Amino acid sequence: MGMTDEEAMLHDTLSELKRQLRSNDSAKIVLIGDVMMDCYIHGYANNLNSRAPVPVLRETSREEDVGAAAHVARGLRSMGLSSHLFGVVGDDTAGLSIIESLEAEGVTTHGIAIVEDRTTTVKTRMLASRESLIRDEQLLLRWDIEEDDPVPDEASVALYEQAIDDLQGASALIASDYGQGVITDQGAEKLFSAAKKGNVPVIADPKLTGLHRTENVDWILFQSQGLELMRRRIGASTGAEAAEKLIQQYNWNHLVVLSGEAGVTIYSADEETVHAPCGLIDLRQMIGLIDAAAVAIAFSLSRGLDVYSTALLANAACECILGAERTDAFVLSKDDLIHRVGEHVWNLQVSKR
């Protein structure tokens, strides 16, 4: 039984994506946003506290990793892209550890400002399982140490000036907003305008409270919950209608919606909607999902790929994260992405034998 025309196009597109991923061509990506530390504490939760109905975690291991925009920078580096990261950290242990970790992986850190007396955001997740059962870990608790005050004016102005100067020759600009004070109204307006003038496409992962900063942005990333919230807020009857209204209101080119087990959908101002279904059966976690999609889109833009190819690549990147069993797999890697795209190609070939 042969492939239909649609299946043949899918097969050829995926095969070309695999070829592109295997190439060693590099490209420059400018990245600005909040930088933080992620800490993971693993253990067993066999008992409840005798004085309160809360589980007791017996720690077995812990690990630290960079998060937010720094997490995106690691993904870009893994994909063979040159990431120029701009953000701030505090003059504390966590901040210095972030810089050291990034430098150890070859990520450029000259754009990270160390702000005196500022607290570096640290998000700690406690992951537990029952020792007597063979079961995946579950998130038990998360607690945050953070400072979301605006970055001091002097540091913020310098940060955006450096980022604007660095746009020359960039294939894309990524803005990663976690609400920690780096992405500002004035800074975003100047940076996005400079990118537009330089024909550098902008990818933005905005807070829903910061959509006003994203007018005229090329690529916007939402999770499905965010689109549903906006649907209710603007009174649209469907997610597709909400996406269309948001694209018109903010003059976006593309709205990328990540829907977990439902896959990835790209709504566009001037093109047909494209949907890539998720091929996973067992979804394990979602940490780093938007970061992975941003990396995949940046890679796609650096190769001049179309929206259809971009949707397939972003979906495969999300599948890598959704199926991750280890915390070190929460960062998108080129090897994992090549393997995932290859699985889609193989499945198409096998199903049509």
State where each predicted segment sits.
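Conserved phosphate-binding/catalytic region of the ribokinase-like
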Residues: 4-20, 169, 186-201, 206-216, ...
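Structural beta-sheet core signal
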Residues: 31, 85-87, 204, 257
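Glycine- and other small-residue-rich loops at beta-strand/loop junctions that grip anionic moieties
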Residues: 86-87, 177-180, 286
